[in-house]
Amino acid sequence: MLACTPKVGITGKPKVETSTFEFDYAFGPESTNPDIYTLTTEPLVERCLNGQCGVIFAYGQTGSGKTHTMNGIMDELCESNIFSEGTEVDFTYLEMLGVDIKDCLAADPNPSPKPVAIGEGLDGRILTRNVSVHPCADSSALKALVSKAKSLRSTAATEKNAASSRAHGIGIISCKDVETGIAGKLYVIDLAGSESAKDSKKHDSKRMAETKQINLSLSNLKECIRARTMASEPGKGGIHVPYRRNKLTLLIKDVFEIGCPRICSTVVITNVSPLASDVAHSCNTLKYSGPLRVAVGKGRVNLEKDEEDPANWTVEEAEARITEAWGSEVGNVKAFVGGLSGVQVR
């Protein structure tokens, strides 16, 4: 991708300075929402249906079209093939700013509902509290939930955007195989826009505090992705990924954890403004996004499926393993397992 920056030379004559950035694909003004969905999200959906984890998010300055892009992707997701036979689909939508987390689909109409909490269990699993999970029987049910979540997003007028998203919007789609009990997850994240000092110069104290929280969480997200990208390269061991510093990166821990047994995939969509007045911020966005790309052939080969890990056992395997190890002590193994797979028993 080529970015052209208008400048004035030392002689006073105008000139154009060019910068080149490498990405896997660049979408132009002729690209449609279905085009973007097909190239960026459709492969993640297939992986999610196979019990894997996928994350897609849009990053860029406020007013560059992130929410429009992610709304288009969510609309296409509602019409996708996730509602296949033998698959249970659940949907959750959270809004996050710093340590403050809101469940946009909470049933409690109280203006001060119970606070949402995200933490890490002793076994490494991510645990949530006061988060509602909504079963979706078909695309119409998912559409209704997505529409409700959109209407409850926190927005405010800023210098660049009359309806700027002031928090990260996180849609979580879970697709569980009824037979095995293994659920794949897809996180669709509409990040709040990054803002420069120029963008926020007219903010009041509340907006300034929001901007500080937004930029801090975006900085940590970029640091985690860069570290994880480096760790994917052969010979790059001992790299620390600081996903525990922020609730957003903790929530999608599987994407960043080195050695995670679940196959995870991440897609970063970089949104830039076409305005000449925004070229400095656009170049800065491209500069930070470019290194997040993993070159083809350099990714770390995924770990082989560990047959000894209970998370990989089907219902039948869980019953057989428990019978072999503790059959006489457990008694009725089928009642003990309760039709749960290894990942559920675990």
Predicted features along the sequence, with ranges:
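Charged, amphipathic alpha-helical linker segments immediately N-terminal to NTP-binding catalytic cores
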Residues: 1-38
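Flexible beta-alpha connector loops of hexameric P-loop NTPases
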Residues: 30-34, 130-136, 161, 198-216, ...
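Pre-Walker A adenine-sensing motif
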Residues: 38-49
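Conserved nucleotide-state-sensing and coupling region of NTP-binding domains
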Residues: 49-180, 243-250, 266, 273
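Switch/connector loops and helix/strand junctions flanking conserved nucleotide-binding motifs
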Residues: 65-67, 99-105, 196-199, 235, ...
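Switch II (G3) loop of P-loop NTPases
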Residues: 185-203
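Sterile Alpha Motif
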Residues: 302-338
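A short amphipathic alpha-helix within small helical-bundle interaction modules
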Residues: 336-346
